[in-house]
Amino acid sequence: MARSGSRSDNGLTGIQLEHIGKRFGEVTVLADLSLQVSRGELCCLLGPSGCGKTTALRIINGLLEAETGRIFLHGADITNVPPQKRNLGMVFQSYALFPQMNVFENVAYGMRRRKLPADIIRQKVTEVLGIVRLPGIEKRRIHELSGGQQQRVALARALVIEPQALLLDEPLSNLDARLRADMREEIRRIQRELGMTTIYVTHDQEEAMSIADRIVIMNRGKIEQTGTPRAIYENPATEFVSSFVGNINLFNGTIENGKLSCLGAHFPIDPAIMNPGEVTCALRPENIQFISGGSIRGVVREVSYLGSIIRYKIGLQHSTETISVQTPATDAAYVIGDTIGMTFDPKDLRVFPRNQ
């Protein structure tokens, strides 16, 4: 490992990872991972199971040791600093609350280990329970709380020590869908209120899209793309990102003589975008429109009513391929067996090299 030290702090960087590498046996979990999170930013690490996102979080917190690279917090090198001295708040997937302690004792735990005066501890516990909207429950036992209340207590315990940054490892995965949505809003409110630098790990794309200032898409120990939720969704940099974030149609195409051939139709394409040859095309279901004279023809195979939207599965004529189309529920509805025409704006199409 690199030796500890510091670097010039411009006052803007909260957490910085430089060339982090980690292996478990023969398996490379993180490969030369570099990341910078600004102060006050909520950054989501998003990716499938095994992509390295939780490993990265535990390396930042000091629960795991990286084999290569350095970690900086507000400009200070904390690579070799013990976990308890890194001044980071951590919320685990399991909450890690102490069942034998009441709420007050759980929240006060970190401050008591730091030997703060009793009156200061009481004051801070009261303040932080107010922030997470759980006033007056100091004497309640953990088993008396709902899942959402336990999550708030875990968050209060992480915040009460006034950390320089907050780390959350899939904190909502044990809650039902409605409570997850409510807690996302609460975490975002608290993070903004405190201006807390936050790294939030999740495999749930909706969770990341709704809560993050910036999303980091991880795959096989590497970063595939970094950007705002909108940039990630509308301009995926790789085929993996396009298929992992949101619903999307992936289908084969061919570029030749300045034209893209796909879905039985032909479209002009800028030669600078992609070399001639076979490609994979990506198109969001909501970017396809039904139109009677559309050059793409198909037959409705499935219809799913989803409240505000209707999702269709369309079998393409003269092809074994199917595509999904999503329309507002207020639009004219089609039924299984209908033959329809479709079109889309070529600017909404993303093209990637085949087998990228």
Give, region by region, the residue ranges found by the protein language model:
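Non-catalytic connector elements of ABC transporters
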Residues: A2-R3, I248, K259-Q356
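ABC ATPase nucleotide-binding domain
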Residues: Q16, Q36, F72, G341-T343
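Pre-Walker A (P-loop) beta-loop-beta motif of ABC nucleotide-binding domains
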Residues: L33-C44
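ABC ATPase nucleotide-binding domains
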Residues: L42, P83-G89, Q93-F240
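The feature captures the beta-strand-to-loop junction immediately N-terminal to the Walker
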Residues: L46-P48
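Helix-to-loop junction immediately C-terminal to a conserved catalytic motif
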Residues: N61
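Conserved ABC transporter NBD signature motif
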Residues: G69-D77
